[in-house]
Curated annotation (Swiss-Prot):
Pfam families in alphabetical order: YbcO
Lineage: Bacteria, Pseudomonadati, Pseudomonadota, Gammaproteobacteria, Enterobacterales
Keyword set includes NAD: no
Note in the entry: Encoded by the cryptic lambdoid prophage DLP12.
Enzyme class: hydrolase
GO molecular function annotations of the record: metal ion binding; nuclease activity
Protein name (record): Putative nuclease YbcO
Organism the protein comes from: Escherichia coli (strain K12)
Summary of the function given for this chain in its UniProt record: Based on its fold and a conserved His residue, has been predicted to be a nuclease.
EC number: 3.1.-.-
Active site (record annotation): H32
Family: Belongs to the YbcO family.
Binding residues for Zn(2+): C13, C21, C54, C57
Keywords, in A-Z order: Hydrolase, Metal-binding, Nuclease, Zinc
């Protein structure tokens, strides 16, 4: 599989939390989405369970900041994961 962490760098943020997103692709990284049963202390989910996120949205979905409700941050992250996967499918980075 492609290196999704490298593929995420320099891309437009797909999380796009209103009032939080910095819109700066230079800060974008692969942000893993924490889901019960897929991660724990010191364990990240697989790279497919992630989204392209700017540093500000990444901080919010990882709850290092608390500008929006946690449930809304997770909703934005899951929508971002869907957008990220569609981008990578179209580019052939991942396969269906």
């Amino acid at each position: 599989m492609a290196d999704l962490r490298k593929a995420a760098r320099g891309r437009e943020c797909q999380v796009r939390i209103p009032g939080v997103c910095n819109g700066n692709p230079e800060t974008s990284v692969l942000a893993h989405i924490r889901l019960t049963g897929l991660c724990g202390t010191g364990t990240k989910p697989p790279d497919l369970i992630a989204t392209i996120a700017c540093s500000a949205c990444h901080d919010e979905i990882d709850r290092r900041t608390h500008f929006v409700d946690a449930g809304y941050a997770k909703e934005c992250a899951l929508e971002g994961m869907a957008r990220t996967q569609v981008i990578w499918l179209k580019e052939g980075v991942i396969k269906a």
